[in-house]
Swiss-Prot record:
InterPro entries: PLAC_motif_containing (IPR006461). The chain crosses the membrane at residues 57-79. Belongs to the cornifelin family. NCBIfam families: A_thal_Cys_rich (TIGR01571). This is Protein PLANT CADMIUM RESISTANCE 3. It comes from Arabidopsis thaliana (Mouse-ear cress). Its main location: membrane. It is a single-pass membrane protein. Keywords: Membrane, Transmembrane, Transmembrane helix. The keyword Methyltransferase does not apply.
Amino acid sequence: MASQHLQANPHAEGEWSTGFCDCFSDCQNCCITWLCPCITFGQVADIVDRGNTSCGTAGALYVLLAAITGCGCLYSCIYRGKIRAQYNIRGDGCTDCLKHFCCELCALTQEYRELKHRGFDMSLGWAGNVEKQQNQGGVAMGAPAFQGGMSR
């Protein structure tokens, strides 16, 4: 399953879909990240690593590294580079590290929004997004289909 490639929503090459300080454009994720950044990081890592690193494993490693070194950004900045490489977004490793070191929460929420903008349902993880795409019968992952809430 991890070897499958999902094609997401197209976006202008070379740029992030949202600004670095646009944390409040997704208030729910902003609050979750502020309270427990390991959750957002785990969700990002699961998608970026295409299911090879689970949300729980990545989140636990993030917490462990943050507890030991006081700097979870040592781990999370690597994923910013992976996102840039996957989507041809301009930047470099030094800037990635600085952004995570200076404002970890802004960096994590921007990465979360980027993946969400590209069509991933962050709550499903990689495997859930693959399954969702297969159930829709598509080859490439486009914009997520609207699924209504509970009805009576």
